[in-house]
């Protein structure tokens, strides 16, 4: 089994690579590679799309790596490969992003990415630090995870999901902020699992052993 972490020049992937490789060893999930090789992405059994920075910049970088982008889309849309989006990689699953300008996303989960606007003016943006998960729907990504378990966030924009059944978990930050989305063979995490200690590692392991 091969898991490809897609490298499209959007952030340092070292900590994510180490976390995924550790959990692949612990779960017997095979090999994990960081790659910008379209052929390797096409052959991978599951895909991970990270992302740090602004939505339009990440979208442009991803689409700018055309062979890589096409291989990823074909693997997910036509071959049904399990897919995990992390942070901006999760946001790119949306229909549209509204950071600085309107930017089309992948359109895999209907909704848009908008600035966080806490009802409590004392809450600062970006939303940075630990927050407690409110799980809204059962999903294999939550195996061994309980409501109230905390994970680590750093973001100023969040995914406003159109279909409530595709928002799998949220956190409270002056109102609900989407934490996990998913449908079919796709799941996305707004938080950084590689920075979320035991809970994040457990979710990485859950993805690596998920057979949708």
Swiss-Prot record:
Entries under InterPro entries matching the protein: Class_I_gatase-like, GATASE, Imidazole-glycPsynth_HisH
Protein name: Imidazole glycerol phosphate synthase subunit HisH
Upper taxonomic lineage: Bacteria, Pseudomonadati, Pseudomonadota, Alphaproteobacteria, Rhodobacterales
Pathway(s) annotated for this protein in UniProt: Amino-acid biosynthesis; L-histidine biosynthesis; L-histidine from 5-phospho-alpha-D-ribose 1-diphosphate: step 5/9
PROSITE patterns: GATASE_TYPE_1
Molecular function GO terms recorded: glutaminase activity; imidazoleglycerol-phosphate synthase activity; lyase activity
GO biological process: L-histidine biosynthetic process
Gene3D superfamilies: 3.40.50.880
Keywords annotated in UniProt: Amino-acid biosynthesis, Cytoplasm, Glutamine amidotransferase, Histidine biosynthesis, Hydrolase, Lyase
Active site: 87 (nucleophile), 192, 194
This protein's GO CC annotations: cytoplasm
Locations listed in the record: Cytoplasm
Known catalytic reactions: 5-[(5-phospho-1-deoxy-D-ribulos-1-ylimino)methylamino]-1-(5-phospho-beta-D-ribosyl)imidazole-4-carboxamide + L-glutamine = D-erythro-1-(imidazol-4-yl)glycerol 3-phosphate + 5-amino-1-(5-phospho-beta-D-ribosyl)imidazole-4-carboxamide + L-glutamate + H(+); L-glutamine + H2O = L-glutamate + NH4(+)
Annotated EC: 4.3.2.10, 3.5.1.2
Binding partners and assembly: Heterodimer of HisH and HisF.
Function as written in the Swiss-Prot or TrEMBL entry: IGPS catalyzes the conversion of PRFAR and glutamine to IGP, AICAR and glutamate. The HisH subunit catalyzes the hydrolysis of glutamine to glutamate and ammonia as part of the synthesis of IGP and AICAR. The resulting ammonia molecule is channeled to the active site of HisF.
Domain Glutamine amidotransferase type-1: start-end pairs: 2-212
């Amino acid at each position: 089994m091969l898991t490809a972490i897609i490298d499209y020049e959007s952030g340092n992937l070292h900590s994510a690579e180490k976390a995924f490789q550790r959990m692949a060893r612990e779960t017997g999930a095979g090999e994990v590679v960081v790659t910008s090789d379209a052929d390797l992405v096409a052959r991978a059994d599951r895909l991970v799309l990270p992302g740090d920075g602004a939505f339009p910049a990440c979208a442009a970088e991803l689409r700018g790596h055309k062979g890589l982008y096409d291989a990823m889309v074909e693997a997910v849309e036509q071959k049904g490969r399990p897919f995990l989006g992390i942070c901006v990689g999760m946001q790119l699953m949306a229909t549209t992003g509204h950071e600085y300008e309107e930017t089309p996303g992948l359109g895999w989960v209907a909704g848009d990415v908008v600035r966080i606007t806490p009802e409590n003016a004392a809450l600062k943006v970006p939303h940075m630090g630990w927050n407690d998960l409110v799980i809204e729907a059962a999903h294999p990504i939550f195996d061994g995870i309980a409501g109230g378990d905390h994970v680590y966030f750093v973001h100023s924009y969040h995914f406003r999901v159109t279909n409530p059944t595709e928002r799998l978990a949220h956190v409270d930050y002056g109102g609900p902020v989407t934490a996990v989305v998913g449908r079919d063979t796709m799941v996305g995490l707004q938080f950084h699992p590689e920075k979320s200690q035991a809970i994040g590692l457990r979710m990485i392991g859950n993805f690596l052993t998920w057979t949708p």
